[in-house]
Amino acid sequence: MSELKDCPLQFHDFKSVDHIKLCPRYTAVLSRSEDDGIGIEELDTLQLELETLLSSASRRLRVLEAETQILTDWQDKKGDRRFLKLGKEHELGTPIKHSKPKKQKLDGKVSHASGPGPGRPKSRNMQQKMQEYEFTDDPVDVPRIPKNDAPNRFWASVEPYCADITNDEIKVLEDLLKTPEDEADYYKIPPLGKHYSQRWAQEDLLEEQKDGARAALSGDKKKGILGPLAELDSKDVDSLLKKSDSQHDQPEDGCPFGHLTQRLLQALVEENIISPVEDSPIPEISGKESGTDGASTSPRSQNKPFSAPHTKSLEVRVKEELIAQGLLESDDRPADDSEDEVLAELRKRQAELKALSAHNRAKKQELLRLAKEEMNRQELRQRVRMADNEVMDAFRKIMAARQKKRTPTKKEKDQAWKALKERESILKLLDG
């Protein structure tokens, strides 16, 4: 009985997992037939319930392994203690005549008490018990539970966001607030290039010029035919294109002036200045004059369109003058600009970029302000920790004085009060 009392085993009461209550899906799947199978939507629930069963089994396994190790260690210590006692008796050389009466006395007192005296029979009993508690190694290795490293990885990923703000991070924010040098380039509108029809025409002329130069080298006849075209250069091509544009770009009404110039002249001309046809006398034209006039005016000269120099510059000057006088708004653009889809889209995206950059700049300024405030709070928290250490030091000194049954000195009391007041003032600053 004494051996059972000294046994360090705890004999845990293992509670079995209630499958019906804790693992209802697992129980339902076991009760089905093989033909029913398992649905895809049930896999997540089954995984959780199987993990619950695995954790319960691993917990029981760990407890049993701990109990086995405790039992083995206890038997080893007990055997070593008894073998040491036997060795000491043999070294002392106890005579046999003294041991026999003791053995007889022990045999006579077996019914009354069983003392734990040293001897051969006890060692045999100990060996038998050791054989009883020997555990054979299971050939099947128990699978090791994988280490759950998810919390460590989670906190390692969160730590940079919860760490204290440093001066380097403040410097990074200040650098981000600086205006980049190339910011103005994003708001520039590139000049309008040549129209694709003009560019293609120029490319066609240049290509014909190259073809003519190649053909001129082949023979004199071809050189005589294509020579003038082959001698053209890029400047001649541009002049030809401008000439063709000036001939074909005449308005439908034949007037070379722009819309603003025409509207201005229409506003200045007085209406109803032509008298009726009946009242106006018809002048008589002599035959000589009519002959000369008839000879001078030909159908070809009548069909020739009217042209005036510097009409485009006149249109621009009229527009500038009307804007300066306040008769025309400066935002009014010509019809070509208003119909330019690329320019409209470019202006739209530039406006969005301005709004977005302004929003980002405001957020960065707010973030910089909050970071500087947090830096000040970090310094206050550091001072609070130092004040806490001072308060704890003063408290230890006072407690040590009371343990020695002496009253704390005035210096110790003043130091404690000073530390407490300083801590309160720092906390007020931190809360404020």
Swiss-Prot record:
Any single GO CC term annotated in Swiss-Prot or TrEMBL for this entry: nucleus
Record's keyword terms, sorted: Coiled coil, Nucleus, Transcription, Transcription regulation
InterPro entries reported in the protein's UniProt record: Histone_AcTrfase_su3
Polar residues bias: start-end ranges: 293-305
GO molecular function terms attached to this record: transcription coactivator activity
Residue ranges, annotated region (Disordered): 90-127, 275-314
Coiled coil: 335-398
UniProt entry tagged with the keyword Cytoplasm: no
GO terms (BP aspect): regulation of transcription by RNA polymerase II
Compartment(s) where it occurs, according to its Swiss-Prot or TrEMBL record: Nucleus
Cystine connections: none
Task of the protein: Functions as a component of the PCAF complex. The PCAF complex is capable of efficiently acetylating histones in a nucleosomal context.
Family affiliation: Belongs to the NGG1 family.
PANTHER family the record matches: TRANSCRIPTIONAL ADAPTER 3 (PTHR13556:SF2), TRANSCRIPTIONAL ADAPTER 3-RELATED (PTHR13556)
Protein name: Transcriptional adapter 3-A
Species annotation: Xenopus laevis (African clawed frog)
